[in-house]
């Protein structure tokens, strides 16, 4: 969606909701809030709507209140309160419908209150966080590094025995959820404000382009090669730390090599 169409959609959404007296307010979140990150052609609309008590479910199950609702091709109930909506154009909405009391179940970083008939600004402010993710303790780092090494090993073993789907998820996803928070705290950067304090995988490459490029290059390899490449990054960035589990990393590398030979034999 181009920038003009993106803004127009947001304006029409707000106008329609403001005209409905059952609606108490609207909050745009993430890049839709247009604060630290401006939406681009790949951005969805991320928002939540606060309604009078008792009418929330109607907004979650009927979509006439959405702009261009006749062009919706898919709706998915993601959580009790939240949905994903897909339009024929490929544009997507991610939103939740709350009453005022339910707002406390949400999480926010960037946000803007589009309109508020009472209480929403206070409720949103109470759940919003603009502070960086909490600093990891030495024990946290040790646990995350240990988990990353173990997950690489488990993933490689599954790939080697023919469980490629499961193994690749361990290598390409589970491992990074433990590794990236450690790298974000350890690596130097002129400005870490672009990092997402709710999702450690977001915008990593923007803040750490060199290491981000290494990780992406590893992920573009075959599964065992990806595991090897991620292990290379772990040892390169963290290997000189006093508490780095050098022997464990060497063991994992040995297992990865064995798994690569086993996979090739199949």
PLM regions: where:
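Conserved NTP/Mg2+-binding pocket subregion across the NTase superfamily
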Residues: 2-5, 65-166, 170
